């Protein structure tokens, strides 16, 4: 609704400014129209900045304002205030159109075509098979999943990809520890998920290496060499441990409702990059050093490609082995061939900024794709109160245990409320997932997070359980209304004159704009904070207003339609944020 009004006003203002420019013989390259919310609601619903037009057209603000008002006509109430023209909407029409639109479009409300047919790949999660997922992975996963849903809501054709890192020295560390200390233990014998069992051996390796560093390093290199040569026993061990780890990781994905369209294993595709570099050498895009290594020159600061100071970057070592950047080049080629993407987004922590700047520059120079088609969506770290997590020391909050801990805390609270209620375990899990997902999304993604379990589970603050609770409360209101079995009547939206009702309507009507902004900025926190704003406003309204009034059924019908629109919008937010909707709490 608000988007339609803004587009209508923009067209009328554009027409007015062009006519004024033409009459003054002024050539305009671009007309930038600034619309914003007034600081106070009584000033209007939208403010248009006129001052810039005055400078360009060399006309007074009142003259320009009057011409715009003529063009707008009687459709909106207008009032000039200094450099601004304030607009007031027709409330009755606006309320009716907004509620009808939401309740008609339902789960599609908010969807738009701002990214229509744009082919986007999002690579996220990308775990190593030497440990379970921890809360840092959860932030990566929920950003990737949520952003995928937001981009889809804006019309993009999204492909979600997961590249599982299942080879290399870090994987060999768990393998070596298992060979030394495993005693043929299995997840079944240990009564542990496979990824947790493998993670234990990763920690054991680091304990062993701290006492035998040189020996351990030599053993790791020997094990890696044996794997690369296809040694049967080594490959069998690698296959067994990787399967345990991947099966365990997939269980966590299933619990957290994280899905992928395609899962790659690094071991299956890492050689593609070598071919890309050799082809680049043949085409003269890179060069061979005296020792046989194949290199390319990159700017010393890859965020400034005009910098003329270059340094050498090895793409293939003298012995023919590749580096991670080379493997990533191969992945870009493979995905370009398979999906012909318009853009590829990598959801990876901020510590990898330099790697991706270099990767994108080299991909461009080798003619693989324009570096502007490649995006590193950098996110901040998730820290414990004690500091940064380190999996090699076992100092992590692993995802499964975090979910379990929060579920147990929630169960204790639920048992106080529902002594005889069934399925409390499922309810506790869904509340816990809402708590975790919301907490990891509500902060702007580039910022670090200090994870606070108690705060994440709060039912009263800016939290996932609060959003879930407001949704459940509205559902309860609707159930109570439906049980009255009142006759169906046309809703009289003219009765919704409460200022709180108007504020809620305006928030609902802006949902599409929030999705567009979240898509453009690639920032799910915009939707998270929007959902809290809507939930908080409805909660205030509910406390101050009698929604079901048996003595005024006409008003009740109108307020119930409003409540339905709020619930649908909250449910749509929850879907975008991968937060479970709960009917009863």
From Swiss-Prot:
Please indicate if the UniProt record lists Protein biosynthesis as a keyword: yes
By its UniProt entry, which Pfam families does this protein fall under?
Answer: Arg_tRNA_synt_N (PF03485), DALR_1 (PF05746), tRNA-synt_1d (PF00750)
In alphabetical order, the GO MF annotations are: arginine-tRNA ligase activity; ATP binding
Q: Which residues cross the membrane?
A: none
Reaction(s) this enzyme catalyzes, per UniProt: tRNA(Arg) + L-arginine + ATP = L-arginyl-tRNA(Arg) + AMP + diphosphate
Biological process terms from the Gene Ontology for this record are: arginyl-tRNA aminoacylation
What SMART domains does the entry give?
Arg_tRNA_synt_N, DALR_1
Task: List the residue ranges forming a coiled coil, or say none.
Answer: none
Reported EC number(s) for this entry are: 6.1.1.19
Tell me where the sequence motif 'HIGH' region sits in this chain.
Answer: 127-137
Gene Ontology terms, cellular component aspect?
A: cytoplasm
> Sorted alphabetically, which InterPro entries does this protein's record hold?
aa-tRNA-synth_I_CS (IPR001412), Arg-tRNA-ligase (IPR001278), Arg-tRNA-synth_N (IPR005148), Arg-tRNA-synth_N_sf (IPR036695), ArgRS_core (IPR035684), DALR_anticod-bd (IPR008909), Rossmann-like_a/b/a_fold (IPR014729), tRNAsynth_Ia_anticodon-bd (IPR009080)
**Keyword terms:** Aminoacyl-tRNA synthetase, ATP-binding, Cytoplasm, Ligase, Nucleotide-binding, Protein biosynthesis
The protein's location, in the record's own words, is: Cytoplasm
Recorded hits in PANTHER family, A to Z, give: ARGININE--TRNA LIGASE, CYTOPLASMIC, ARGINYL-TRNA SYNTHETASE
Alphabetized HAMAP family for the sequence: Arg_tRNA_synth
Q: How does it assemble?
A: Monomer.
| UniProt family annotation | Belongs to the class-I aminoacyl-tRNA synthetase family.
What name appears for this protein in its UniProt entry? Arginine--tRNA ligase
């Amino acid at each position: 609704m608000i988007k339609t009004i803004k587009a209508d006003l923009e067209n009328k203002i554009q027409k007015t400014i062009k006519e004024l420019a033409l009459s003054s013989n002024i050539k305009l390259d671009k007309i930038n129209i600034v619309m914003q919310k007034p600081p106070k609601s009584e000033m209007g619903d939208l403010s248009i900045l006129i001052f810039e037009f005055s400078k360009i057209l060399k006309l007074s603000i009142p003259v320009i304002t009057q011409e715009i008002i003529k063009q707008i006509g009687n459709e909106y109430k207008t009032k000039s205030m200094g450099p601004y023209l304030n607009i007031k909407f027709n409330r009755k029409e606006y309320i009716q159109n907004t509620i009808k639109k939401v309740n008609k479009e339902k789960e599609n409300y908010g969807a738009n075509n701002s990214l229509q047919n744009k082919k986007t790949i999002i690579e996220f999660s990308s775990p190593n098979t030497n440990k379970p997922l921890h809360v840092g992975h959860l932030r990566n996963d929920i950003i990737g999943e949520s952003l995928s849903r937001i981009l889809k809501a804006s019309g993009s054709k999204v492909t979600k990809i997961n590249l599982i890192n299942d080879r290399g020295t870090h994987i060999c560390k768990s393998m070596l520890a298992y060979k030394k200390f495993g005693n043929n233990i299995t997840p079944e014998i240990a009564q542990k998920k496979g990824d947790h069992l493998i993670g234990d051996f990763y920690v054991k390796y680091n304990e062993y290496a701290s006492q035998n560093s040189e020996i351990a390093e030599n053993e790791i290199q020997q094990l890696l060499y044996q794997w690369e040569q296809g040694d049967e026993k080594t490959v069998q061990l690698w296959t067994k441990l990787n399967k345990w780890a991947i099966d365990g990781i997939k269980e966590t994905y299933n619990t957290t409702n994280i899905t992928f369209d395609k899962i790659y294993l690094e071991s299956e595709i890492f050689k593609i990059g070598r071919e890309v570099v050799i082809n680049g050498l043949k085409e003269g895009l890179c060069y061979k050093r005296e020792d046989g290594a194949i290199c390319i020159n990159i700017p010393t600061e890859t965020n400034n490609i005009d910098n003329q100071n270059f340094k050498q970057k090895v793409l293939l070592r003298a012995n023919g082995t590749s580096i991670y950047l080379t493997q990533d080049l191969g992945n870009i080629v493979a995905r370009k061939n398979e999906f012909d993407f318009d853009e590829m987004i990598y959801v990876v922590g901020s510590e990898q900024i330099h790697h991706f700047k270099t990767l994108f520059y080299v991909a461009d120079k080798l003619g693989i794709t324009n570096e502007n088609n490649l995006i590193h969506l950098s996110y901040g770290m998730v820290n414990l109160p004690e500091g940064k997590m380190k999996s090699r020391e076992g100092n992590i909050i692993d995802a499964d245990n975090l979910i379990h801990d929060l579920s147990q805390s929630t169960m204790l609270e639920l048992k106080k409320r529902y002594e005889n209620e069934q399925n409390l375990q499922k309810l506790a899990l869904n509340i816990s997932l809402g708590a975790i997902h919301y907490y990891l999304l509500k902060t702007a993604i580039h910022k670090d997070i200090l994870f606070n379990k108690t705060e994440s589970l709060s039912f009263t603050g800016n939290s996932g359980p609060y959003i879930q609770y407001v949704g459940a409360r509205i559902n309860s209101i609707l159930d109570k209304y439906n049980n009255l079995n009142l006759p169906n009547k046309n809703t009289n939206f003219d009765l919704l004159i409460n200022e709180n009702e108007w504020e809620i309507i305006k928030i609902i009507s802006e949902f599409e704009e929030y999705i567009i902004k979240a898509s453009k900025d690639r920032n799910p926190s915009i939707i998270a904070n929007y959902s809290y704003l809507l939930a908080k406003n409805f909660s205030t309204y509910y406390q101050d207003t009698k929604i079901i009034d048996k003595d005024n059924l006409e008003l009740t019908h109108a307020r119930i339609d409003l409540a339905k629109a709020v619930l649908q919008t909250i449910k749509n937010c929850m879907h975008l944020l991968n937060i479970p909707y709960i009917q009863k709490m």
